[in-house]
Amino acid sequence: MNKIVVEVSVGELLDKISILEIKKEKIKDPEKLRFINNEHDVLKDQFLKNVKSDKKLDSLFKFLKEINNKLWVIEDDKRLCEKNSDFGDEFIKLSRDVHFLNDERAKIKLEINNHTGSKIKEIKEYTSY
């Protein structure tokens, strides 16, 4: 297969790197980790070559990773509810939490893009709540 090269926003790149770092911490299967580590190395290399980091960007990345870590836990908890066919108050709370955290995640990614002058920006628009 040919290599696919696409331009992405800095926020999207850091989001993906943060998720891969979480996977490296959570996933234990050596075969899966081999692919995760490879993808992480490729993306991290592109970040280091193409993005000038500073304290603000480091802080935004840390916050983005914290949000993604919370989302990981929530999604695991939702799967347990699914497994137990429990779609009551806890499932509803978890599902709502995903919306709120994803809104925060989008704001952080946009802030990263604005801070770094990224040409590409992920723009979101949802019904207000």
Regions found by a protein language model. Name each.
Residues 1-129:
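Extended, charge-rich alpha-helical interface modules
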